[in-house]
Amino acid sequence: MNMAQTVTQNPRGVKTLLPLDVELRNVFKFFNQEPAVHGVDLDVRQGEFFSILGPSGCGKTTTLRLIAGFEQVDAGKLLIQGQPMTNIPPYRRPVNTVFQSYALFNHLNVWDNVAFGLRLKKSRKSEVESRVKEALKLVKMESLRSRFPSQLSGGQQQRVALARALVNRPAVVLLDEPLGALDLKLRKEMQVELSNLHKNLGLTFVMVTHDQEEALSLSDRIAVMNQGKIEQIGTPQEIYERPKTSFVADFIGDTNLFSGEITVLEAEYIQIVTKTGLTIVVARNEDTPAELLKPVVVSVRPEKIQLSLYPPSSLNNCFEGRLINVMYLGTHVNYVVQLINGMNINVLQPNTFGNLPDRETPIYAWWAESDCLAINQMTND
């Protein structure tokens, strides 16, 4: 089979070629003449855990449904394992979908739910027996094979839904917010199980979610979507540490954003004066905007900001303010500091189990030039 390939690096840094299991090329999908998916380009590599992350209504679920075949592409190309999927129905695509609602058959027990697809394909009885047994073992549900969905917990139902998807041995497993219906503790447990399952099977997983922590913890790469378009594709670390747009910076985790323009350009740093009069110095990297008077947004993560009662000597990015809120979070403490220009910033620091400062305490907030990031100001920011 003639599959497209992509260059990647293994842990030793040696470049290798990996086939692409899913390719979207300038894909559009319209509803009532409005684009739900707007010129999307993305590649999913064989064996990759790829997440599409974004807020409600951003087009991520529609994109997944296009890959599954539940919706048809209006413009552009969609390929799975190098083959065009135009007019190919869902049952003929080498994919299986796990839905948030699980979509189990209530009148069938666990075994029959998992076996349903194989029986529909008229697989041999011996093959059905061995593959269902294997799938239930993978998700640790062998002992509950005779139970009905109504007799299972949410986590157990999720495992059955996963087994039903895996039993057909698809090239690509599609996950539609698979953990969204679970409580926080169970969701974290299932994240670990899902990650282990992916590593053990080596299959390609494509997941859509609005949960940033879920995407960051599970994914090899993430595509961040907004208003039908891809804002950025990268590893979890790239997405969090080096966001390309202010939307990505603000959506992934928490951040403090300062709008301003570049007033000084030097080889190793730029200086920005914000709209509220602060002067911020940012260390340069290959993505740093480099044009005088260029409108930019400065992003500073709360955990990168330090607090002190006295001003550090000879330090850029040090601003006087006062505490207006202190929130105890157990292992961490979240501080809200109002700077002298009236802007409120969030600061997250480890809990050192000392006495917490009182509200209205005068304080200095500061951060290193390398701990903030300048991003091009977009017209819709």
Curated annotation (Swiss-Prot):
Gene Ontology CC annotation, any one: ATP-binding cassette (ABC) transporter complex
Catalytic activity: ATP + H2O + polyamine-[polyamine-binding protein]Side 1 = ADP + phosphate + polyamineSide 2 + [polyamine-binding protein]Side 1
EC number: 7.6.2.11
Principal location class: membrane
GO molecular function annotation: ABC-type putrescine transporter activity; ATP binding; ATP hydrolysis activity
Domain ABC transporter residue range list: 22-252
Disulphide-bonded residues: none
InterPro entries: AAA+_ATPase (IPR003593), ABC_SmlMolc_Importer (IPR050093), ABC_transporter-like_ATP-bd (IPR003439), ABC_transporter-like_CS (IPR017871), Mo/tungstate-bd_C_term_dom (IPR008995), P-loop_NTPase (IPR027417), PotA-like (IPR005893), PotA_ATP-bd (IPR017879)
Keyword annotations of the record: ATP-binding, Cell inner membrane, Cell membrane, Membrane, Nucleotide-binding, Translocase, Transport
Membrane topology of this protein: Peripheral membrane protein
Pfam families xref list: ABC_tran, TOBE_2
Residues involved in ATP binding: G54, P55, S56, G57, C58, G59, K60, T61
Stored Gene3D superfamilies: 2.40.50.100, P-loop containing nucleotide triphosphate hydrolases (3.40.50.300)
Keyword match Ribonucleoprotein: no
Taxonomy, superkingdom: Bacteria
Localization of this protein: Cell inner membrane
Annotated family: Belongs to the ABC transporter superfamily. Spermidine/putrescine importer (TC 3.A.1.11.1) family.
Known function: Part of the ABC transporter complex PotABCD involved in spermidine/putrescine import. Responsible for energy coupling to the transport system.
Subunit structure, interactors included: The complex is composed of two ATP-binding proteins (PotA), two transmembrane proteins (PotB and PotC) and a solute-binding protein (PotD).
Record's protein name: Spermidine/putrescine import ATP-binding protein PotA
Organism: Nostoc sp. (strain PCC 7120 / SAG 25.82 / UTEX 2576)
